[in-house]
């Protein structure tokens, strides 16, 4: 079996996180392969140019040499296995951008503008992107939420990104990547961070759909206080992380936590 076919079948045999009904359009390949109407195919995933230096390993080294054509081919490959939505994890790493910017020198990559390369490819093949607005500080999510200096740079970057890239048809919205841990609730700093960032995003791109991805639902308490927090947050999509991939939750247990949610 070809690698792409294996990935396609693997994805269609998994259970996706529930997202708004407007986002449940199923590609033709998925419709053909998914015979169980109760199981919704996975139609979105993560995307990144580089991971953190501590964990990136061979991944970072390989992607650092990608040409614009290789990025284009990668986006098309992802679309071919049934993905319709991609969440770009970062437009910068440790304060240096992956795109041409006036804020700081660009991280050396195999093409001049990887962000333009992937968004242009997504326009061609019909993928929608949630575009990140970080990482302009260290990887401590709470520090980045609270640091006003980082917020200033973040907003400058969003202005640049909106000016350079929001004309793309695939620019569906923003991803705010400073992920809050639910222990068992959102901290107040996270609520403020989300609302301030969303307000700025909506001024730049009024039709944007914005997404956050808090973790881990294993420790969350879904009660009236949690609901009140959600009611305060100006956010369109919350993509809850189960933590299976980082061994925080077992695959077998994840279903019951989503059921509680």
Where on the chain are the PLM-derived regions?
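N-terminal export signals
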Residues: 5-27
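C-terminal segment of N-terminal export signals and the immediately downstream linker at the start
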Residues: 1, 21-38
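Short, cationic motifs built from Arg/Lys/His that form the positively charged side of catalytic pockets
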Residues: 3-4, 202
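Generic detector of short, well-ordered, non-transmembrane alpha-helical segments enriched
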Residues: 2-3, 170
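Intrinsically disordered, low-complexity regions
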Residues: 1, 12-14, 45, 91
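Glycan-processing catalytic domains of CAZymes
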Residues: 33-261
